[in-house]
UniProtKB/Swiss-Prot annotation:
Organism ancestry: Bacteria, Pseudomonadati, Pseudomonadota, Betaproteobacteria, Burkholderiales
MF-aspect GO terms: ATP hydrolysis activity; GTP binding; ribosome binding
Amino acids binding GTP 2: 186-193, 233-237, 298-301
Name of protein: GTPase Der
Role description: GTPase that plays an essential role in the late steps of ribosome biogenesis.
Originating species: Burkholderia pseudomallei (strain K96243)
Residues at which GTP 1 binds: 9-16, 56-60, 119-122
UniProt keywords, alphabetically: GTP-binding, Nucleotide-binding, Repeat, Ribosome biogenesis
Amino acid sequence: MKPVIALVGRPNVGKSTLFNRLTRSRDALVADLPGLTRDRHYGEGRVGARPYLVVDTGGFEPVAKDGILHEMARQTRQAVEEADVVVFIVDGRNGLAPQDKSIADYLRKTGRPIFLVVNKAEGMKYTAVASDFYELGLGDPRAISAAHGDGVNDMINEALEVAYAGEPQESEEAAAARGIKIAIVGRPNVGKSTLVNTLIGEDRVIAFDMPGTTRDSIYVDFERNGKHYTLIDTAGLRRRGKVFEAIEKFSVVKTLQSISDANVVILLLDARQDISDQDAHIAGFVVEQGRALVVGVNKWDGLDPHVRERTKADLARKLKFLEFAKFHFISAAEKTGIGALMRSVDDAYAAAMKKLPTPKLTRALIEAVEFQQPRRRGPVRPKLRYAHQGGQNPPIIVIHGNALDAVTETYKRYLENRFRETFSLTGTPLRIEFRSSTNPYADKD
């Protein structure tokens, strides 16, 4: 699973600036979830082939007793507990503050790897910047400028060396033997643990821990109708005897890690509750990660027909961006609708891994353009010449041509729908990339 880097420090030391630098964005992938302060954000970064999650915590007051500072401190502690590496940021311009000492005292007790980072060090000699902070007892300070990027790459590379050390690497053969990896995600109390137990059956549980990170990752292998699957622990499912029960402390980090690690995600919703912003944020992260998706609307049994219609309308309105996914109305407790749900899991995975031959893609592209040409932008009309597959899981279709910057988002969605229909790409996000070039085979017989 992707390691977690937590950014910790008192207010105004540059945590958000470093967050934006590491994630190469000005916003979080998942933000403002209910129960979280607006100052705690989650994003994704990558160095080469090493992806990671980064948590931007609020300003930390370790001894805050009540109010918003207490809540921010509680959430920061949770972020530290879930982190593989903690980056403790201090302010090189203003020097050592009493609050820095309190935070350092707390962090030393956690047992987490700590990287002491002195920010705002641009234009200053290292000895002058670092000297004050040795007394924190956290080793050699690393001087950076989050605003300008100085020293950031070296720092994050060192942090990832620590975070990935001891991470168990699974062979391709072992991964294939596991079958489809499924993450079941959703808010607390939507029925995740009930669905897990319905899927695996009490007498077929094979659970084991994979040590090597600060959080043991629980995988559950099971077989259904002769097919092998692996369930990934999602946000607090823990085994008690032969049954899995939900620990109702919603963990954003675990949810994001599980989604990233999965082949297919089952987003579980509660038919008896309104669709929340949190549901939409989780769904958005699944799409952003390019994961195949099936939506299960649980607790459907016994609902009044009028309530069912209202729920369907609510789903269509609030989750319109999931039109590519299959929705199933199920009861995990009564074990109804589960077979169809799992068939959609198989179909979504098959779609995500489908191979799309270049001749067929190009033919589909030409037919789409003949049916509806892209609009001109001023005097320029885009010319779409040929297409090939650029990747799987999710499928990536690369379109070559001229003046492709003029292709509108509306036309891009039109092409996506045409490709989905032609190649039966239900249940998976689809990426379309445009590259201005010429077809090397255009003038050849």
